[in-house]
Amino acid sequence: QAKRTGKYLRKHKSIQAVYASPLQRCHATAKFATKGMELDINTLDGLKEMCLGDWEDMRFSELAEDHDFINRATGDIHHSAPNGESLDQVATRVVAAFRQIDEQHADDETVLVVSHGVALAVAISVFLHNSPARWGDYHLNNCSLTEFELSPDPIVYRLNEYAHL
């Protein structure tokens, strides 16, 4: 999937910078997606996935069924798994990372950000609705493309596009 994404990006986009979560899978995805572009991959801790603490190795279905975590976290953005992060904490961290990236690049530059599903959904929810509570509205497939502009009123040009896969 990452190779196909890279092929699409090389053909259709001019990318000036790449940022990725430091977690291995994201970094590998960024490497495959930018092969041949001669760009360094900048890692930002703020792009990491939501930390689920004591529940980190559980499947999403287990979290939903056994702990009602998804409903509880969506209903209360300050709710967290034991020793984990709340949606509010994820929002603060991920939005700060996007703002940092935005500040380091000119308005006409295209920056590729490779992160994780929940982290990206939370960021999109904050940018469009000023709250992480609607993160569940934004399902993002692996290696899908979401393109937006961080202006005072953020603009989404594409969301979860995966026809290139």
Regions found by a protein language model. Name each.
Residues K35-V95, E149, Y157-R158:
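Phosphate-handling substructures
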Residues T5, L39-N42, M50-S61, E103, ...:
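Acidic, low-complexity terminal tails and accessory targeting/binding regions
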Residues A28-T34:
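Short Gly/Thr/Asp-enriched flexible loops that form oxyanion-binding sites at enzyme active sites
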Residues D107-G117:
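Generic beta-sheet signal
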Residues Q1-A28, S80-V95:
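Loop-to-helix element that buttresses phosphate recognition and phosphoryl-transfer chemistry
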